A protein has these predicted regions:
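Active-site-proximal cap/loop segments of hydrolase catalytic domains
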Residues: 1-138
Length: 138
C-alpha cells in the first residue's frame, strides 16, 4: 500500500519505487480477500457504506486514486499464490503505470505466495531488486 500511495504523493523525493505484493486498490481488494476481519479492521468497514466516515476516509486514500500523479519508475513484484493480497492488485498497478507511460517492470513469481521462499526465486528476486536500484540510483 505505502509504495503505491507514495508514488502519487511524493513531490519528487524518490527516484524509483519497488513494491512487493502491495495493495493498490482498496475497493477491489475488499472483494478479493477472504480475510474480512483484517480488511474491515484496517479500512473501518466496506466501501459502499457512505454513512461510515472512517471507512470513507480510508477508501478516499486508496493508492489507485492518485495514479494521475504517478511519474516515477516503479518495479512491482508479486506471487501468484498470494492469497492475502492477490496478485491482481499488482497487475492493476502495473497496468496503470504502463498506461501512464511510467517506466515500469512487473516481476511475477508463478509459484510463490506473499514471500519468496524458493532458492532459485530468491536469486531472481535479489537480481531484479538490486538491478532496479542500480538503474535509477546510480
Amino acid at each position: 500500500y505505502s509504495v503505491y500511495y507514495l508514488a502519487g504523493n511524493h513531490d519528487k523525493r524518490f527516484k524509483a519505487f519497488i513494491s512487493h505484493c502491495g495493495i493498490f486498490n482498496f475497493e477491489s481488494m475488499y472483494g478479493e480477500t477472504e480475510e474480512l476481519f483484517f480488511i474491515n479492521h484496517d479500512y473501518g468497514g466496506n466501501y459502499w457504506d457512505k454513512s461510515n466516515a472512517i471507512a470513507q476516509r480510508s477508501y478516499a486514500n486508496s493508492p489507485h486514486k492518485f495514479v494521475d500523479r504517478w511519474d516515477t519508475p516503479i518495479m512491482i513484484i508479486t506471487g501468484e499464490y498470494d492469497f492475502r493480497i492477490p496478485y491482481t492488485q499488482s497487475l492493476q498497478a502495473f497496468t496503470a503505470a504502463r498506461l501512464k507511460g511510467v517506466d515500469s517492470r512487473l516481476v511475477e513469481f508463478e509459484n510463490e505466495g506473499h514471500q519468496v521462499f524458493k532458492p532459485q526465486n530468491s536469486i531472481v528476486w535479489n537480481r531484479e531488486f538490486f538491478g532496479w536500484l542500480d538503474k535509477y540510483l546510480k
